[in-house]
Amino acid sequence: MNKIPNRQAICEVLMDKAKEDKDIMVLCSDSRGSASMTPFADNFPDQFVETGIAEQNLVSISAGLAKCGKKPFACSPACFLSTRSYEQAKVDVAYSNTNVTLIGISGGISYGALGMSHHSAQDIAAMSAIPNMRVYLPSDRHQTKHLIEALLKDEKPSYIRVGRNPVEDIYTEDNCPFEMDKATVLKEGTDVAVSYTHLRAHETDSYL
């Protein structure tokens, strides 16, 4: 079964779409490697912005680009994107209703040995508390691809949390039912209802 990190899936679909859509922009805060965005930066240098370790600038620049008609995807570790640049995410992106997609990479404790400074237990709750900000946690590469394609057309503030490690496929390329802001039924039953998302999807599904 195919296993790649969802962050890699994001890069792949953005690279595919950026060939035709020159308004797609990727911004990183010294995190292109961690975000798996190095191939995008190498192949589309005019559509890539490196802000350095400056998360507030990352988000504000993204909002400004969106106001100019661009489609920015701002990538940074979830632990910093949801704390250091929280005011900018709230005011410049969500309250201003700008077309910015924030991508929090290596969410939860997936940074492992880097320790508590890089862990993010708060990002989902923090971003969900901001009016106008939608929060997404795709389960595998196929769902991630559909989500990015939908967000390119949707043009509303969004936050995506992805993990660091490869995840097994839940869906297939030909069978990935996807509807924006709607849950997907994976298995039918009568005894119990189980709701799950993100990286726990494959693990939970194996028990049902």
Roles of regions detected by a PLM:
Residues T184-G189:
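Short beta-strand-to-loop junctions in surface cap/lid or active-site-entrance loops
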Residues T197-T204:
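Conserved small/polar residues in nucleotide/adenosyl-binding loops
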Residues K156-P157, T190-A193, S206:
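Conserved active-site beta-strand-loop modules that form the wall/rim of enzyme catalytic pockets
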Residues M1-R161, P166-V167, N175-P177:
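Thiamine diphosphate
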Residues M25, A193-S195:
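Conserved beta-strand elements of the Class I
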